[in-house]
Swiss-Prot record:
Keyword hit for Transferase: no
Record GO cellular component, one term: nucleus
Main location: nucleus
Name by which UniProt lists this protein: Replication factor C subunit 3
Role this protein plays: Subunit of the replication factor C (RFC) complex which acts during elongation of primed DNA templates by DNA polymerases delta and epsilon, and is necessary for ATP-dependent loading of proliferating cell nuclear antigen (PCNA) onto primed DNA.
Subcellular location: Nucleus
Family under the similarity heading: Belongs to the activator 1 small subunits family.
One annotated GO biological process: DNA-templated DNA replication
SMART domains hit by this protein: AAA
Organism this protein belongs to: Bos taurus (Bovine)
């Protein structure tokens, strides 16, 4: 049994529920049988990957849905071996080079070279080029991005790149200038409510409009998250009620408890406990940027106006350090330690002011 988010994923540009004008423009783009390199960007859950797969379906037909998982070993110049997993069809290859860490440059060069020099197996839908889909391009190192820029020029005749990322701010200008940028905005609350109602109707369920609206708001306009929460509500309780509780993910609850622990006590022992909790989140593959953002959001609830500005500025500083460094736990712990010192001083100054 597949999840609703996969079961009802649109397969063609005509089936998309929102941003239909953009879908029509994308269809016109690929109808000629060719297109430039694309840079598709937008927030999580906006539908970037769905639109990319619809473009490939429009270009190559149903054969693009016959996917296989491949494991490849790439040897770096220093003789280090890197294991990388890819998803491929006869027409395209999907890879996340940032999985290779600091060796992402070698992965990009080898992958693009292999794809560009290989021939397609099915001649019925033969095109002059194959497509390489690179995800999380904004997480690539600068060396990898410069290598990508050189490689995309070299193999333009036999290979088209579709780059996918959340933000273009971390993509170097030479890559941005060589791609057609396609921004996929987050769906509106009304769009999400419409999709939730449509999916529930196909499942034979009656979804109250009030609950659909609450799900859309709680998901922060992330359609994937809204569908997953709706399915969780279905498992938890049916028939639906307008005021039923919407279950939260375990890591969100755990992060809130961690923030409460930071606020309740500021000692070296508590800092050690919080470090362990942060490690727990990282080992469960919660991205450090999400942890930082979630911690900041929860901690700001316990700060007054003056302190909020200082804490937000401090979080921005350590988030920047997080991007530059390779050990996330150092920067997360440094942020927590700095907040503890700032918050403790703020509370002590407040108590002194109350003593006449």
């Amino acid at each position: 049994m597949s999840l609703w988010v996969d079961k009802y994923r649109p397969c063609s540009l005509g089936q998309l529920d929102y941003h239909k004008e953009q879908a029509a423009q994308l269809r016109n783009l690929v109808q000629c049988g060719d297109f430039p390199h694309l840079l598709v960007y937008g927030p999580s859950g906006a539908g970037k990957k769905t639109r990319i797969m619809c473009i490939l379906r429009e270009l190559y037909g149903v054969g693009v849905e016959k996917l296989r998982i491949e494991h490849q070993t790439i040897t770096t110049p220093s003789k280090k071996k890197i294991e990388i997993s890819t998803i491929a069809s006869n027409y395209h290859l999907e890879v996340n080079p940032s999985d290779a860490g600091n060796s992402d440059r070698v992965v990009i060069q080898e992958m693009l070279k292999t794809v560009a020099q290989s021939q397609q197996l099915e001649t019925s839908s033969q095109k002059d080029f194959k497509v390489v889909l690179l995800t999380e391009v904004d997480k690539l190192t600068k060396d990898a991005q410069h290598a990508l820029r050189r490689t995309m020029e070299k193999y333009m005749s036999t290979c088209r790149l579709i780059l996918c990322c959340n933000s273009t701010s971390k993509v170097i200008p030479p890559i941005r200038s060589r791609c057609l940028a396609v921004r996929v905005p987050a769906p509106s609350i009304e769009d999400i409510c419409h999709v939730l109602s449509t999916v529930c109707k196909k499942e034979g369920l009656n979804l109250p409009p009030q609950l659909a609206h609450r799900l859309a708001e709680k998901s922060c306009r992330n359609l994937r998250k809204a569908l997953l929460m709706c399915e969780a509500c279905r498992v938890q309780q049916y028939p639906f009620t307008a005021d039923q509780e919407i279950p939260e993910t375990d890591w969100e609850v755990y992060l809130r408890e961690t923030a409460n622990a930071i606020v309740s006590q500021q000692t070296p022992q508590r800092l050690l406990e919080v470090r362990g909790r942060l490690y727990e989140l990282l080992t469960h593959c919660i991205p450090p940027e999400i942890i930082m953002k979630g911690l900041l959001s929860e901690l700001l609830h316990n700060c007054d106006g003056q302190l909020k500005g200082e804490v937000a500025q401090m979080a921005a500083y350590y988030e920047h350090r997080l991007q530059l460094g390779s050990k996330a736990i150092y920067h997360l712990e440094a942020f927590v330690a700095k907040f503890m010192a700032l918050y403790k001083k703020f509370m002590e100054d407040g108590l002194e002011g109350m003593i006449f």
